[in-house]
């Protein structure tokens, strides 16, 4: 969600949180008939779509993340099936691990989002979930973040690739050192500024968004 025109934090935040909160409360209940708006949202997010779990925006990865960000905290059988699809994909032994110039160049936001979803839905004790957290800690760069850029000359972590792992590690709770280092990465940038020049990295980041995706 992006607002056009000048940013008005107070008004925008009130409208944004009100709308999200209303939908979140509705999503905690099973839709009665599917005719109400919340029921249609829930039905759409729980529907099984063909294709890869990461397919934008119908894949299980994205639908589960939306449900969790809307406040759903209990996984029904449909959500469990979708979670298993995501975990099977991420933990597939044949999935390549990219390491270039001494740094892991992985799309760590994928594991980070999955870790957050699993922990919010009560699957934090699943060994597969622990493996996701362990991999994120192993792939973390020395500056505290992550980056999927394959170019050897890139040595600075990406904001986009680092926020999801931070959220997931905080939710999982057993890799506090990695989570602290990731938090420090964002704090050094004062959340949205260049570490080297103190400039705003992207002025779009000064606007309120939901969902907080970069696409």
Segments and roles (model prediction):
Residues 1-215:
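Preference for long, amphipathic alpha-helical scaffolds in soluble/luminal domains
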């Amino acid at each position: 969600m992006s607002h056009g025109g000048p940013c008005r934090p107070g008004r925008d935040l009130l409208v944004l949180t009100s709308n999200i909160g209303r939908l979140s409360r509705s999503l905690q209940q099973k839709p009665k008939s599917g005719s109400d708006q919340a029921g249609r949202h829930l039905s759409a997010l729980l529907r099984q779509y063909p294709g890869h779990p990461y397919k934008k925006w119908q894949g299980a990865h994205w639908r589960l993340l939306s449900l969790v960000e809307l406040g759903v905290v209990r996984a029904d059988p449909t959500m469990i099936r979708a979670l298993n699809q995501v975990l099977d994909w991420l933990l597939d032994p044949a999935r390549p691990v990219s390491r270039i110039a001494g740094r892991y160049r992985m799309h760590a936001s994928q594991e980070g989002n999955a870790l957050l979803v699993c922990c919010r839905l009560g699957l934090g004790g699943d060994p597969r979930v622990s493996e996701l957290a362990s991999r994120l800690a192993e792939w973390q760069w020395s500056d505290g973040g992550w980056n999927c850029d394959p170019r050897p000359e890139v040595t600075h972590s990406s904001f986009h690739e680092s926020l999801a792992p931070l959220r997931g590690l905080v939710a999982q709770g057993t890799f506090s050192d990695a989570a602290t280092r990731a938090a420090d990465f964002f704090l050094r940038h004062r959340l949205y500024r260049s570490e080297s020049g103190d400039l705003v990295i992207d002025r779009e980041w000064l606007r309120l968004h939901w969902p907080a995706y970069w696409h």
